[in-house]
Amino acid sequence: VVWRLNAWRTLPAMCVAVGLLMCLPLWQKPRPDEWQVYMLDVGQGLAMVIARNGKAILYDTGLAWPEGDSGQQLIIPWLHWHNLEPEGVILSHEHLDHRGGLDSILHTWPMLWIRSPLNWEHHQPCVRGEAWQWQGLRFSAHWPLQGSNDKGNNHSCVVKIDDGTNSILLTGDIEAPAEQKMLSRYWQQMQATLLQVPHHGSNTSSSLPLIQRVNGKVALASASRYNAWRLPSSKVKHRYQQQGYKWLDTPHQGQITVNFSAQGWRISSLREQILPRWYHQWFGVPVDNG
């Protein structure tokens, strides 16, 4: 293999950039009015962290494989490095690419509370009508309906997190049939600043009515780079962009960070911070993933 000479010239600068980036948690202390949402780069799964005042809540825990899981390999070290103490987990649904890291996380922090729509032992309900406060943020569940015994994607717990000015809607793997049912009754409460794109950007989800009712500014999608399903779908990405959303996804941006404050919100991504030209030269960025 012959590497590009330009890439080698940037290697020292890249090493310095990585070193500085790794030190950021050591000197950056968020202000009390700030809170963060992180979409971690866990591959073909979903794991998000909501953080404020040194505490954290997880929304999904990534995937599992025969030799390990996202909790053990990524989420636990990441939380330790950022000096975040998790207090709870919201599990959208039972599929392994969303709950794969849960056991490892509970082994490290056995006192965590869990909310889910699964009716499993020791799980608090995450169903329509549930609402709670955490660190000054309001969490409200909008799907599934209470008493539903369905499973799978369309039983995903849809949660809105709101600071009174800005908000994010977390959707798990909800698909178009459930989106339609949810919007037919509760569309007035769906508006949010940011939206986690359902089901990794699959065309089975993100119906136009959902995109329009949320009326957000940014769509965030989690998927693996060059995945076999070609997600996120180019049709879905175009659908969001046609409605005025800025589109970001982990296959292209890596970890995505949203910082909310009294001044508004701003987004940064890991690959933008670690010399994107170097990254693109060596690994390439496809025009489209689906």
Where are the regions that the model predicts?
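Non-globular, low-confidence helical/coil segments that flank catalytic cores
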Residues: 1-290
